[in-house]
From Swiss-Prot:
Pfam families: HMG-CoA_red, Sterol-sensing. A motif (INSIG-binding motif) lies at residues 75-78. Residues 1-9, 79-89, 150-159, 221-248, 340-887 are cytoplasmic. Glycans are attached at N281. It comes from the Eukaryota. This is 3-hydroxy-3-methylglutaryl-coenzyme A reductase. Residues 61-218 form the SSD domain. One of its GO terms (molecular function) is coenzyme A binding. Regulated by a negative feedback mechanism through sterols and non-sterol metabolites derived from mevalonate. Phosphorylation at Ser-871 down-regulates the catalytic activity. It catalyses: (R)-mevalonate + 2 NADP(+) + CoA = (3S)-3-hydroxy-3-methylglutaryl-CoA + 2 NADPH + 2 H(+).
Length: 887
């Protein structure tokens, strides 16, 4: 029951960090300000001459207090030294934050308790530092640091609070009760010390339960920078902290503490209420003391300095014991900052880095293809099956398999122990470990035990042994990436498996696979990965569109395409730029349902077309997403089959998955009103997706965009090398009449699909959707005072595009989206990035149309393609697969 309550508390605090932090700080400031502004305004030594009660200050008291301060500083130093052994700057920073804020809360409480008398704080701080226990705070931080995502951070903090909260609460209670016994001793100094101790314990507990978990959650959220799908603060040697901490609380110890606390409660109750002397006597004595104090009235004096100067002088004036304490603190701080790192690294170098490596993330290179950190990187002679396929498995395995940890300048990942990601290479010591493997693959049973072992795992198996397990059906081939220590090794092993089954074993030699962030691919973009396909990316621009300039990335293997589009962009820019508008925005999904009779289908159709029916379906549809908002239904019949075309906004996502989820929920709601309805398929090709369809050309799908520009006659002659009249003539007879003669649907253009597909591949879109997205009609007219200028427009009714999800999560594709300023979701106006990308696509299509039509009108098309789009390699010197086979 208690664990569940603490778990709920931890989840709430971690999920609302800003609210908790602001609330805690506000409460602390309120405690201080209420005392400052409601107390008296007498400040002894500044504006009042207060009566002094002389007390004998023994030199032994000063010595004891100095020793206590030094011990407290040493204690804090050793605690931070132990934390540094973990090798995480986040643990240190978070622990420091905990210490600083705990001190602030404790100081506030002491000042409030002593009515602004700061001399008591000087004596209290050493006891506070001695009672700080960073082990609990660091344990909770470890829970958070073992997470892979921000949601997992919250869950792990909640789990940590469920495990640590009851224990820490009981410990705080017992400490307060034990230390509180000293407040009943009758010795004034001991009572003050014990009172400070109790306040210290309570301040620590308050910060640990409120401010600290919220701060951990917020710090990790703000510092989250993904690398191979994991945050930069994720430490692999914290992966087992959960199971370790779950077994920590000792039931016997817990019971003893509970019995102790009950006994101490009885002691306090007996001493304070049962055995307390007569309250009348104490009241009389108190009144006498009060009267005595009142007789010696404080005298008001005129302050000689300002209040801040008064407090500053009190802080600057130091006694010999304070000089000793500050000197010790300064020396330890210098040692910790400048000399501790090398000692820590030399100590950690003796430990096994296989179980606790800290991977140092590096900044991504300019091409945005990040290198995946490899915990274990095989050498080129790693196993009997080489990295490149086509090698027989009969070759022997190397006996020694080095695990190399290289420096930042190398092509492999770097392991840095006890240092942050920005540490210099000198501090980043490297080491080479060796794992001995038998010369022959071990039996499957032994390999399975190693694979399933928490201490060893796949890194202790050779590639030949992994392949042996795959062939024996112990490892599914599609799970290689998730079971290996790195995704790249899983891809490598799959290539080796595949090479033996290909007609040409060396077929994959020139298909690259190294140094790619496969964590962004898995579960999102592709399965059974064997590498990635590099495609040349060119840039066309600047495209002057709606008063802005864009450099448009285009991934293509067709020569002349980028150059031609670039010429069109130049012509548009010289003509003053293009203008565009988004006419409609709505993705569609068209399921098919069946009813017993055609009349029943007609009844459902009529009900869906009523405002009441549409409202019911819209409520069900809209409940599935923050962005999906049903706009309209287009319903048609074919016999007893009913086709319902849902159209909805989908924010910055292309939206097929989003609208499919909403459609499914809406159909289930519709089935409640018409139980006899049968759902045949959530997609009945009435959408229509990735197929030529007149409904997309007429009704639109995705973004409907129109773009226009006026090209001056001079630009037509000098840049496009033709005339306005010739271009209009070719456009009418080619794009309009020619397409009509061919029975084209939406193909009233020269080559819109070229530009659309090139941009789609570069920007991570679904390339198959160029079928509908390339629907375009290009119109040209004579314009200007003398009808020599060229007016051109492109209307594209079905651009299916998005800036989040799918391939847009891949880093190279994100780089291309960033070139256009539309990467990710638009926070201010959801959907605006996707709409802007659709405008850019339409504007670039118009540039491509302009240039190609000019080339056709001038007769330059064949000549340019002979220069830029023709291979100059003598193919007779190369033997293809079929030629080689026949030979």
């Amino acid at each position: 029951m208690l664990s569940r309550l603490f778990r709920m508390h931890g989840l709430f605090v971690a999920s609302h960090p800003w609210e908790v932090i602001v609330g805690t700080v506000t409460l602390t400031i309120c405690m201080m300000s209420m005392n400052m502004f409601t107390g008296n305004n007498k400040i002894c030594g500044w504006n009042y001459e207060c009566p002094k009660f002389e007390e004998d200050v023994l030199s032994s008291d000063i010595i004891i207090l100095t020793i206590t301060r030094c011990i407290a500083i040493l204690y804090i130093y050793f605690q931070f030294q132990n934390l540094r052994q973990l090798g995480s700057k986040y643990i240190l920073g978070i622990a420091g934050l905990f210490t600083i804020f705990s001190s602030f809360v404790f100081s506030t409480v002491v000042i409030h308790f002593l009515d602004k008398e700061l001399t008591g704080l000087n004596e209290a701080l050493p006891f506070f530092l001695l009672l700080i226990d960073l082990s609990r705070a660091s344990a909770l931080a470890k829970f958070a640091l073992s997470s892979n995502s921000q949601d997992e951070v919250r869950e792990n903090i909640a789990r940590g609070m469920a495990i640590l909260g009851p224990t820490f609460t009981l410990d705080a209670l017992v400490e307060c009760l034990v230390i509180g016994v000293g407040t009943m001793s009758g010795v004034r100094q001991l009572e003050i010390m014990c009172c400070f101790g109790c306040m210290s314990v309570l301040a620590n507990y308050f910060v640990f339960m409120t401010f600290f978990p919220a701060c951990v959650s917020l710090v990790l959220e703000l510092s989250r920078e993904s690398r191979e799908g994991r945050p930069i603060w994720q430490l692999s040697h914290f992966a087992r902290v959960l199971e370790e901490e779950e077994n920590k609380p000792n039931p016997v110890t817990q019971r003893v503490k509970m019995i102790m606390s009950l006994g101490l409660v009885l002691v306090h109750a007996h001493s304070r209420w049962i055995a307390d002397p007569s309250p009348q006597n104490s009241t009389t004595e108190h009144s006498k003391v009060s009267l005595g104090l009142d007789e010696d009235v404080s005298k008001r004096i005129e302050p000689s300095v300002s209040l801040w100067q008064f407090y500053l002088s009190k802080m600057i004036s130091m006694d010999i014991e304070q000089v000793v304490t500050l000197s010790l603190a300064f020396l330890l701080a210098v040692k910790y900052i400048f000399f501790e790192q090398a000692e820590t690294e030399s100590t950690l170098s003796l430990k096994n880095p296989i179980t606790s490596p800290v991977v140092t993330p590096k900044k991504a290179p300019d091409n945005c293809c990040r290198r995946e950190p490899l915990l274990v990187r095989r050498s080129e002679k790693l196993s009997s099956v080489e990295e490149e396929p086509g090698v027989s498995q009969d070759r022997k395995v190397e006996v020694i398999k080095p695990l190399v940890v290289e420096t930042e300048s190398a092509s492999r990942a770097t392991f840095v122990l006890g240092a942050s990601g920005t540490s210099p290479p000198v501090a980043a010591r490297t080491q080479e470990l060796e794992i001995e493997l038998p010369s022959e693959p071990r039996p499957n049973e032994e390999c399975l035990q190693i694979l399933e072992s928490a201490e060893k795992g796949a890194k202790f198996l050779s590639d030949a042994e992994i392949i042996q397990l795959v062939n024996a059906k112990h490892i599914p081939a599609y799970k290689l990436e998730t079971l290996m220590e790195t995704h790249e090794r899983g891809v490598s092993i799959r290539r080796q498996l595949l090479s033996t089954k290909l007609p040409e074993p060396s077929s994959l030699q020139y298909l690259p696979y190294r140094d790619y962030n496969y964590s962004l691919v898995m579960g999102a973009c592709c399965e059974n990965v064997i590498g990635y396909m590099p495609i040349p990316v060119g840039v066309a621009g600047p495209l002057c569109l709606d008063g802005k300039e864009y450099q448009v990335p285009m991934a293509t293997t067709e020569g002349c395409l980028v150059a031609s589009t670039n010429r069109g962009c130049r012509a548009i820019g010289l003509g003053g730029g293009a203008s565009s508008r988004v006419l409609a925005d709505g993705m569609t999904r068209g399921p098919v349902v069946r009813l017993p009779r055609a009349c029943d289908s007609a009844e459902v159709k009529a009900w869906l077309e009523t405002p009441e029916g549409f409202a019911v379906i819209k409520d069900a549809f809209d409940s599935t997403s923050r962005f999906a908002r049903l706009q309209k239904l287009h319903v048609t019949m074919a016999g007893r089959n009913l086709y319902i075309r849902f159209q909805s906004k989908t924010g910055d996502a292309m939206g097929m998955n989003m609208i499919s989820k909403g459609t499914e929920k809406a159909l289930l709601k519709l089935q409640e009103f018409f139980p006899e309805m049968q759902i045949l398929a959530v997609s009945g090709n009435y959408c229509t997706d990735k197929k030529p369809a007149a409904i997309n050309w007429i009704e639109g799908r995705g973004k409907t965009v129109v773009c226009e520009a006026v090209i001056p006659a001079k630009v037509v002659r000098e840049v496009l090398k033709t005339t306005t009249e010739a271009m209009i003539d070719v456009n009418i007879n080619k794009n309009l009449v020619g397409s009509a003669m061919a029975g084209s649907i939406g193909g009233y253009n020269a080559h819109a699909a070229n530009i659309v597909t090139a941009i789609y591949i570069a920007c991570g879109q679904d390339a198959a959707q160029n079928v509908g997205s390339s629907n375009c009609i290009t119109l040209m007219e004579a314009s200007g005072p003398t009808n020599e200028d060229l007016y051109i427009s492109c209307t594209m009714p079905s651009i299916e595009i998005g800036t989040v999800g799918g391939g847009t999560n891949l880093l190279p594709q994100q780089a291309c989206l960033q070139m256009l300023g539309v990467q990710g979701a638009c926070k201010d106006n959801p959907g605006e990035n996707a709409r802007q990308l659709a405008r850019i696509v339409c504007g670039t299509v118009m540039a491509g149309e302009l240039s190609l039509m000019a080339a056709l009108a001038a007769g330059h098309l064949v000549r340019s393609h002979m220069v830029h789009n023709r291979s100059k390699i003598n193919l007779q010197d190369l033997q293809g697969t079929c030629t080689k086979k026949s030979a």
